[in-house]
Amino acid sequence: MRFLVLTGLSGAGKTTARGFLEDLGYFMVDNLPPRLWLPLLQEAAARGLARVGVVVDARALAFFQDLEEVLEALRPTVVYLEARPEVLLRRYNLTRRVHPLGAGNLMREIAEERRALAGLRGRAHLVVDTSELSPRGLKEALARFLGEEGGFLLRLVSFGFKWGPPQEADLVLDVRPLPNPHYDPALRPRTGLDPEVRRYVFSEAAEPYYRALLAVAGLAAEGARAEGRAFYTVAVGCTGGRHRSVAVAERLAEELSGRFAVEVVHRDVEREG
């Protein structure tokens, strides 16, 4: 699982960055106390979420006495956004927003916030000065740092129809017509990650059907990228989500990884029943 902390100066672009991270599939939470970060990650893992982010701003630091300890224990990726004081001042004047530490003197509030966040800045894996960056430039900087090819991510989610398709799916592929290892006693306890299960699923007779699925997934992802989408989710479903869907999602990832940045999530592989 990827865990990211997004922080930095107010007016430096955290709202833009948060939206872009959500487009990349991150589940984002604002100012969650650090003592709740581990339970959040545990719940996210149980729900098949592969990317989680927490936004931290200066207002919350007074309530985050355990922040250093939790950062040391969980070691998230920390992204810090900043800008020159005169740029932040200009942005506030344009939007007529009140600074979160609002006390009537904007330059003093900016300096106070910078001091308050100095510890987090020192821990940052990426510091971005957005003074001369457009929103698009900020997104591109984040995409490069996070290893997202062109800012576009193809997500492949295996699932079982008996548990319901993923709500976030843009495209659902039905692989139930493929050979089912469930009916082979030797293969039933295994998963689609097992080489023997994969050989069973991808028999010679199954190959035309798989190639058609590959073509559809590739065309759909290409179209989404051309439209400027940040990510596209292809859900791959079999009956229980343990054998065929897992095997197909893995093979799709292997064959499409040369064209897209790909992430694979096996939502139901450990479910029983």
UniProtKB/Swiss-Prot annotation:
One of its GO terms (molecular function) is GTP binding. Gene3D superfamilies: P-loop containing nucleotide triphosphate hydrolases (3.40.50.300). Disulfide bonds: none annotated. The keyword Protein biosynthesis does not apply. It comes from the Bacteria. GTP binds at residues 57-60. ATP binds at residues 8-15. It holds the Pfam family PapZ_C. Keywords: ATP-binding, GTP-binding, Nucleotide-binding. PANTHER family: RNASE ADAPTER PROTEIN RAPZ. Belongs to the RapZ-like family. NCBIfam families: PRK05416.1. Displays ATPase and GTPase activities. This is Nucleotide-binding protein TTHA0319.
